[in-house]
Amino acid sequence: MLFRSALVVTIVVLLILAGVSINLVLGNNGIITKAKEAAEKTAEAQEKEMTERNLLEQELENSLATPTPKPQPTDGVKIPAGFYYVGGTKTSGIVISDNENDKDKYRNKAVVGTDLLGNQYVWIPCTTDNTSSELQYTRTEWGVEVDGDDNSRAIKDELTLTDASVTYSDVDTANGINADVSKEIVAQIKAEKASVAKYGGYYIGRYEVGKNSDTAVVKYNQTPYAEITWSTAYGLAKKIITNSEATSYLCSSYAWDTAVNFIQNNSTAKNYATSITGFNGNWNSQEVKDPSENVIKPAGTSQQLNTGLTTQFCNIFDIGGNEAEFTTELNPGTSETVVLRGGGYYYDYPAGYRWDCSSGYAYVDYGFRATLFLK
């Protein structure tokens, strides 16, 4: 009886051990299952290693290959922070705007439209290297008025404003033109030249400065910011841009003359500096037509037009005609200190002509233009 009981126990134990062994081999966590999982993981690791190796080989191959450069419409021209490339080329006039919605709107197109939202400037490529055949950043003398009580010439290089011979009349000092301002202007011209030497050009306002409430803007179809003295225009221009990469100035004689030469070299306006004929600009004797050939200002009339309603050259409007424009060119101590440029709707003076007025004049046909120089 005892033998039979022991046999039963032995059989039960063997059965239990057999079940455990089978479970170890065939169960969910059994040896076969684990071996299968290990094989799958090994295959996955090998496949991942092969993929990564192929990627590395491709990257190495790409790095050794000579890349095909993508055409860049800005052609190395630096766009300052807060501005965006709109359109144009180095020869037709690269246009930038401070509104991101204008970005690339006329990409790779020579002529840029006026349907933009931001303040706009045009790149003038030039150099200070006088051994170069490229456009020089320099002054050019075309027509010059000679008049006034002292029969003075309306021309003076800004870099001579700190010469010992320079004096200031009571009218000058009463209207903010003095030795300190002259020092500022000399420093401005030197900074402009340094910027051009470093970056190969500068930006000029696409339009005459307009007035939106009391804000100075450089946009299409704005009332020109006029009826202000030279000193007010000088101060406003310096505040148009507050930027870590660019400084705004009242246009200098260097910037003005270089822009006129750029237009003559790169557009149909070959004699823009010395003539008013055939340019659809707002001069007294000329009629002005809109793009649909409708006359918006008859010939023989004096009428201020909003910015950008005439014909552009190199994507720049009204360098000749509309407002007479203040620059940093001054001739202190003479009967008429302030030099004006660009003709005007009361006159028939061409874009390159220089004439002058008193430092206290603030007329509706006297405006100004801003420039941007990269830091």
Label each residue range with its predicted role.
Residues P67-S133, S248:
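GGW-centered surface loops in extracellular recognition modules
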Residues N54-P69, A273-E287:
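Short, glycine/small-hydrophobic-rich surface segments
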Residues M1-L2:
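Short, small-residue-biased leader/transition segments that mark boundaries at the very start
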Residues L14-K36:
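C-terminal juxtamembrane segment of a hydrophobic transmembrane alpha-helix
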Residues T127-T131, E208-D214, T328-G333, Y345, ...:
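Acidic glycine-/aspartate-rich tracts in secreted/extracellular proteins
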Residues L117, D147-D318:
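Short aromatic-cysteine micro-motif
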Residues E227-G235, I241, T247, C251, ...:
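Disulfide-stabilized, aromatic/cysteine-rich ligand-recognition loop
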Residues G30-S63:
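Membrane-proximal N-terminal amphipathic helix
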